[in-house]
Regions:
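Juxtamembrane intracellular "pre-TM" segments in multi-pass secondary transporters
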Residues: 1-4, 180-213, 406-414
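Helix-loop boundary and gating motifs at the non-cytosolic
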Residues: 1-48, 206-250
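Structural signature of the two symmetry-related core transmembrane helices
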Residues: 69-84, 274-290
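Cytoplasmic helix-loop-helix junction between adjacent transmembrane helices
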Residues: 97-138
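Transmembrane alpha-helix termini and helix-breaking/packing motifs in multi-pass membrane transporters
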Residues: 142-161, 234, 354-374
Length: 424
């Protein structure tokens, strides 16, 4: 793929910037703008919700202008936003900059996934998904360590400089991504001129089923950051350091073996639906183990070892599911309306992230094991749904490398063979 190294390097650099502020977001913006924590929290919540409403427009923009152009525009907006944050000392100024930045942040995953669809085909999509995820984890971890060191040396006043450093990271990432060259399928230009919109997405029942299945799995993705710390503190009565240890293990495994695990899955020839289902089942196994641990409540040493083992299983589920699930959604979307399709798919993650705090805390108040039970059922249901959807999805979505019979008889969307064709 032409420009692949530039894309990977750009994503890694931008991830360092993200890692410099995400773990300290409220504190970061409080010190950069001088506004109170309460005001910062309200502004970030409101602008984040508005950003969700903007996501369908981002999908339409991708379909009209192409993912690369929109990707570069979002990098420019994010760079400008962080460069302006130190000057946004008043509430209206901070709200304006936060809103513009939130629109770009919320839209970025859609555009990034669409860009992967533009620059890679077949098994290369799975490989690129895994490489990008590993770099994002490594970059965010490096960014968090970097800002921790900067704050230790120069104090909270250094937040202003990290904001500018973040702006610089986004600008450099944009310059690197500008070197990427999308690959077009024959007839794409004509397809883009054909009338299409969100009605087409809403009529695609298999893709909506895929989105619903991903919502169930996405609740599990939110568990590590939202449920895990509360569960340790309120049900297991463990030290806060366990949360830090869990995050460290998860980040290290994602960055260190993510590409290896995804490569092993890809070389096995497994269908993407089945790989994603396996990832969901590994999630379910980890959640059931949490129920067992919460029932037994052993001593602190045993709890520590058990929790770390559970995090390893959970992370393996993430590493198996993420590349396959991402490539599955990208490949199931018709190229002419891929932006709209992926905007719809991304809502599954956004809704899960928005619902997770209230859902988990409400269930946890009843019984510490209850949220894990709900998550285990959800993950198992997602796996079953993926297997059921397999025969209704396009063959090029289900298979990283479609069988020869399918490739030879490939047709445009609407007449294309599904995975069931390969069973004959």
């Amino acid at each position: 793929m032409e420009g692949e190294r530039s894309l990977l390097l750009g994503v890694g650099i931008s991830a360092v910037g993200i890692g410099m502020y995400v773990p300290f977001s409220l504190v970061f913006f409080h010190h950069v703008t001088g506004l109170s924590f309460a005001l910062v929290g309200v502004v970030l919540t409101v602008t984040g919700l508005i950003g969700l409403a903007f996501m369908p427009l981002a999908g339409s923009a991708v379909d009209r202008f192409g993912a690369k152009k929109v990707n570069l525009a979002l990098y420019a907006v994010r760079a400008a936003g962080f460069a302006l944050y130190p000057f946004a000392g008043s509430l209206p100024a901070f709200a304006a900059v936060a809103l513009i930045t939130a629109l770009a942040d919320r839209s970025f995953p859609i555009v990034q996934q669409s860009l992967i669809g533009e620059v890679a085909r077949g098994a290369a999509r799975d490989r690129l998904q895994a490489s990008l995820r590993a770099l994002q984890n490594a970059g965010m971890g490096a960014g968090a360590l970097l800002v921790s060191g900067v704050l230790a040396l120069w104090g909270t006043g250094a937040f202003t400089h990290t904001a500018w450093g973040n702006a610089f990271a986004f600008a450099v990432a944009g310059l690197l991504v500008s070197r990427v060259r999308p690959v077009r399928d024959a007839g794409t230009a004509a397809a883009r001129r054909a009338p299409a919109g969100y009605r087409m997405v809403l009529r695609d029942r298999p893709f909506l089923g895929l989105t619903a299945a991903n919502f169930l799995t996405a609740l599990g993705y939110a568990a590590l950051s939202v449920l895990f710390p509360l569960y340790i503190a309120t049900w297991l009565h463990g030290p806060d350091s366990l949360t830090g240890a869990a995050f460290t293990v998860n980040t290290a495994l994602c960055a260190g073996i993510g590409v290896l695990v995804a490569g092993r899955v890809r070389r096995s020839g497994a269908r993407r639906t089945r790989s994603a289902a396996l990832g969901s089942l590994l999630f379910a196994a980890a959640f059931v183990a949490q129920i067992v641990l919460g029932t037994l409540r052993p001593g602190q040493t045993v709890t520590l070892v058990a929790l770390l083992a559970i995090v390893v299983v959970y992370t393996l589920g993430e590493l198996v599911h993420s590349p396959s699930g991402g490539a599955l959604s990208v490949s199931a979307a018709p190229e002419a309306v891929r932006g709209r399709y992926l905007a719809t798919y991304q809502l599954s993650y956004s809704l899960a992230t928005a619902l997770a705090p209230s859902l988990f805390t409400g269930l946890l108040a009843l019984d510490g094991r209850l949220p894990w039970a709900v998550l285990a059922v959800a993950a198992t249901g997602a796996a079953a749904a993926l297997l059921r959807l397999e025969r209704h999805l396009p063959a090029e979505a289900v298979y990283a490398e479609p069988p020869v019979a399918v490739v030879a008889g490939s047709a445009p969307r609407g007449a294309e063979p599904t995975a069931a064709t390969t069973a004959s």
